[in-house]
UniProtKB/Swiss-Prot annotation:
Recorded family membership: Belongs to the ATPase alpha/beta chains family.
Species for this entry: Pleurastrum terricola
Single GO BP term: proton motive force-driven mitochondrial ATP synthesis
One GO CC term on file: mitochondrion
Protein name stated in the entry: ATP synthase subunit beta, chloroplastic
Function per UniProt: Produces ATP from ADP in the presence of a proton gradient across the membrane. The catalytic sites are hosted primarily by the beta subunits.
Molecular function, one GO term: ATP binding
PANTHER family reported in the protein's UniProt record: ATP SYNTHASE, ATP SYNTHASE SUBUNIT BETA, MITOCHONDRIAL
Quaternary structure (record): F-type ATPases have 2 components, CF(1) - the catalytic core - and CF(0) - the membrane proton channel. CF(1) has five subunits: alpha(3), beta(3), gamma(1), delta(1), epsilon(1). CF(0) has four main subunits: a(1), b(1), b'(1) and c(9-12).
EC number: 7.1.2.2
Membrane topology: Peripheral membrane protein
Main localization, broad class: plastid
Amino acid sequence: MTISVQNKNVGRITQIIGPVLDITFSAGKVPNIYNALVVTGKTPSGDEIRVTCEVQQLLGDNCVRAVSMNATDGLMRGLEVIDTGTALTVPVGEATLGRIFNVLGETVDNLGTVGNKQGLPIHRPAPAFVDLDTKLSIFETGIKVVDLLAPYRRGGKIGLFGGAGVGKTVLIMELINNIAKAHGGVSVFGGVGERTREGNDLYMEMKESKVINAENLSESKVALVYGQMNEPPGARMRVALTALTMAEYFRDVNKQDVLLFIDNIFRFVQAGSEVSALLGRMPSAVGYQPTLASEMGGLQERITSTKDGSITSIQAVYVPADDLTDPAPATTFAHLDATTVLSRGLAAKGIYPAVDPLDSTSTMLQPWIVSKEHYECAQNVKQTLQRYKELQDIIAILGLDELAEEDRLLVARARKIERFLSQPFFVAEVFTGAPGKYVSLTETIKGFNLILSGEVDSLPEQAFYMAGTADDVLAQAEALSK
């Protein structure tokens, strides 16, 4: 962020409490709330100081309280603070693709600065009601289990639940790949308060799977914005807004469909709670900030479809102590249109993507939104899988042969459905050696209807595993019979 030297408004630090700074300005020159301030000077050892902070409170007597976006080590009372006159401004546009940024929009991938000079402030109003696209439409992902049983809404918000090692990263990368190929869209990934190692692993895997093209960055499909666990709470609280601002540019100016990933939305709330306590606000339920609902709403309301394009957001949700009534996840749930739950049991069986077909939900799976055929097919698949789940205890004790003929047939079909819900991914080709498949919704419904109707009862279970469409199943069955 460049600062105009002429007419610069300069204040002085009067108090430092961890990441919170109190700064006094001249009378009549107090900066506005959310203005970015830059602390400049030198440490006693002669090192250059450049710390950016954001105004949070006006204390009176020409004094403001600001939260730092960088570590405050080495700062002293009396240091100069320059008011930039605007909110934090971050780079936007095609030049951001394939790059990694921090909360301030500075690149952290050692590939130099961003070429374009275009920037937008991170604090912006949500789109006006008249600009919103109110039509309910499905966002096709090309992933069978998602499109059939828990479809995503175009411009909606999806919660992604899953522990470590169940395939969250691979699912995210496949979605990024598919939106670029099928919708001509781009993605923005916001790493909010998660492990630095995970951020690095994701970047390396994206380069390996060509989601980021290291040779030609302009062909990359994603921009990455990281504010990881070791960052001050101010950075973790604002990094989601930095990522969202980059996504808004692609939606509003380039008129594209954008996928915005936030990993993890709980850390956004957690950082807000830390900042709230540092600012001296009275804590609310379970120690969270009293402004929890409005902070969450301020972020979520900007994620929407307009008449120009859409931002569809997929948010990993950490549930503290598995307590769904905790104010952080409970506030998040109010904004979600769908949930995608990853199951360790399915991952253990080798069924990937390990999306739980019974636990995952979507408000879009209604007969007046999706087609009647889609709705009936999804309900029949769920009923079959639910009945199979109920019969598993009986099978474990008595064996399959003790079941009634009708139940034996249902179990056989359920096992085929379970395997047909798996699918080879483009981004996993390097690991599996199997070519990835994008399966349209029409093909998905056709394939599951064939299983439910009994037309493919004679085919072996193995033919359905890692098959894309019904034609792939027939081809695999033929190969197995040889």
